[in-house]
Regions:
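Sec-dependent signal peptide recognition
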Residues: 1-9
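Predominantly soluble domains enriched in secretory-pathway, periplasmic, or organellar proteins
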Residues: 11-326
Length: 326
């Protein structure tokens, strides 16, 4: 049976390679599965799996290179970032940012990968071409989120246990500020104008809005879905619509997605999604968003214009991150 599975997977991968070897924007959906040690590849029209890529142990965060020909995957328990060629769906290289890389980002020029090393309480800067660590900066306890500012000058790092965000100058590799936020800060985004940085605080149950000029927390956004206890509201994933008007926050154990007006900072709506809503990603046209549900091993698809759930499809065990080649 295992031989048959390998043969079928090879056929799928070969067909993908032949069809898309010179194409941009295949539409393929990639989902990292922490407990299956794999990346599920799905058809963008049917949401059916068409291939499974064996990865290193515990694949988590994923990021694209600039033209989306390569997908970088953090294999945390193997202490490496794997590079997947989209045309062939095969691993073609590695980057080694020291132990236990969980989240990472890549500078706009595609040269430097910046990763959080959760067990070592530091962040590593890696020259991608040379696969060489060029700087390591101490952080608070359990660094996680890594988000580069829109102008490419600064990187913001969340430190879960220390309850702070570190703001680091990328060119000089120097820490500019340490901003106290809520309990267990996790993921974040910048508004399109770069003036605000929004970060989820999982245990505190709110989002901190940080002014990127003053490095001060300027506002907090709380969530109160009807019928749920405060302790069940655990925001983790966060993203912003490509038009910059609406933010989407996954509320973890609340099994909800919150829709927040970016201008007013007011929650407009809650949608029921899967178990332990963990991450959220957009199609590039902003028409659909995808909520990764790590507790139910599936992904919820939402029509952004109608603000309603249109489908839920299964993936691997304990999905972490979803990326779309569009």
């Amino acid at each position: 049976m295992r031989i048959l599975t390998l043969i079928l997977t090879t056929i799928f991968l070969s067909s993908i390679s032949a069809e898309h070897s010179h194409a941009k924007g295949t539409g393929l959906i990639f989902v990292s599965n922490e407990r299956d040690h794999s990346i599920t590849v799905l058809d963008p029209n049917t949401y059916e799996p068409i291939a499974s890529i064996d990865s290193g142990r515990r694949p988590r965060d994923m990021q694209w290179n600039e033209d989306k020909t390569k997908l970088y995957v953090a294999a945390s328990d193997d202490d490496r970032i794997e590079i997947i060629d989209v045309a062939t769906s095969k691993i073609v290289g590695y980057v080694h940012p020291d132990e236990d890389p969980e989240m990472f980002d890549i500078t706009p020029d595609g040269k430097i990968l910046i990763a959080s090393n959760e067990d070592d309480n530091m962040v590593s800067f890696v020259d991608i071409e040379k696969d060489k660590i060029i700087a390591q900066i101490p952080t608070g306890v359990e660094p996680e989120g890594v988000t580069i500012s829109p102008d490419g000058k600064h990187v913001y790092i969340t430190a879960e246990v220390s309850e702070m965000v570190h703001i680091i100058d990328i060119e000089n590799q120097k820490t500019l500020a340490d901003v106290l936020v809520g309990s267990r800060p996790r993921r974040a985004f910048f508004t399109l104008d770069g003036q605000e940085y929004w970060v989820t605080n999982e245990v505190s149950g709110y989002v901190s809005v940080i002014d990127t000029k003053t490095y001060k927390e300027k506002q907090r956004i709380s969530f109160k879905p009807p019928g749920l206890r405060e302790g069940d509201i655990t925001p983790v994933g966060i993203n912003i619509n490509p038009n910059g008007k609406t933010a989407y926050v996954t509320l973890g154990h609340a099994n909800r997605l919150a829709l927040v007006d970016v201008a007013t900072k007011k929650v407009r709506k809650y949608l029921v999604v899967g178990v332990r809503a963990w991450n959220v990603e957009f199609s590039s046209d902003g028409k659909n968003l995808f909520v990764v549900n790590s507790g139910s091993d599936d992904v919820t698809v939402i029509n952004a214009e109608k603000e309603e759930v249109i489908k839920t499809f299964p993936v691997g065990r304990y999905p972490h991150t979803l990326r779309i080649d569009d």
